[in-house]
Amino acid sequence: MAEQEVKLMKGNEALAHAAIRCGCDGYFGYPITPQTEVIETLSELKPWETTVMVVLQAESEVASINMLYGGGGTGKRVMTSSSSPGVSLMQEGISYMAGAEVPGLIVDVQRGGPGLGTIQPSQSDYFQATRGGGNGDYYILVLAPNSVQEMADFVDLSFELAFKYRIPAMILSDGVIGQMMEKVVLPPFKPRRTNEEIIKECPWASTGCKGRKPVVITSLELKPEIMEQRNLQLQKKYRKIRENEVRYETKFMDDAEYMIVAFGSAARIAEKTIELARAEGIKVGLFRPITLWPFPEKEIAEAAKKLKGILVAEINAGMMIEDVRLAVNGTVRCEHYGRLGGIVPEPEEMVKALKEKFL
């Protein structure tokens, strides 16, 4: 098998290649536009013949997430992918995984809604992803790629963080990033962990190995005092993640008087917006949250101290802007610009919005 390779491919395809290369043990998914290339690519590559990775098309998204729950519970690196309405069907299983502290990777290549909506791109799953879309007090790790390269890179990173903290992780992409083609440097092959390594690294896992003590993985606890302590332990873990795993990127901020906050494909559009605005003498910079949870609230608050205004650009009706406003706590004016229904905003539109709202 080849080591590191440079390819031209879609974001969805890059993610599939990266999954095989980073030692993923199993994929369970169901086709839905605009992420179907993930399962198609995995099926074409036949990793079960090389790395022994399992690839299974489940009968539904509900089945997929419960297969993920079971696979993650054995200490295996397992993943699923879907798009917005499909991920909605997974919310019960994600809540169960969070409650039982089972790691796993969920990929959401967003499309417009609500309901079945459209097959065009959107970023309207932000609340569902960052607030815990199922029942109970929980969070999951959420990474937002803005390039084909990051679609590949975030697979291994998501698995590393998921197992480090025993938490489900999500790559929150969108139809633009999933379908666009770019050069990508695929990572070298990482060997799959042996059962012996899993037993050593994951003492909580239910492996079924001979001579091992039984392990019960569950989110159920009928005694309220014990359940409260379990919840308090989860909150302690979430605080640790907030302290250590915030990721973000800034550009053109040295002399910025205004700042655009955007993630995913909206951040790519914002970069061109900034180029156009600066050509007109408007000093504007970019703040791109890479982790949507944990959210870089302290970093945004610090950046806001020297600003005259913040424009939050999203492909939705206004979701991340709530987190930005909480972060700056009224110290600077925050306004939103977004498009709905699967329409992707143009850079010229963002420049116009920036002028209308602040200048």
Predicted regions and their residues:
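Redox- and metal-dependent alpha/beta enzyme cores, enriched for Fe-S-associated oxidoreductases
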Residues: 248-283, 287, 293-299
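Conformationally flexible catalytic loops at phosphate/diphosphate-handling active centers
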Residues: 166-250
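Glycine-/acidic-rich phosphate or pyrophosphate-binding loops and their flanking alpha/beta elements
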Residues: 8-14, 235-258, 271
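Thiamine diphosphate
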Residues: 37-131, 141-163
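Peripheral docking tails and interdomain loops at the edges
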Residues: 314-359
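Structural signature of the thiamine diphosphate
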Residues: 140-196, 349-359
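N-terminal glycine-rich anion-binding loops that anchor highly charged ligand groups
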Residues: 7-44
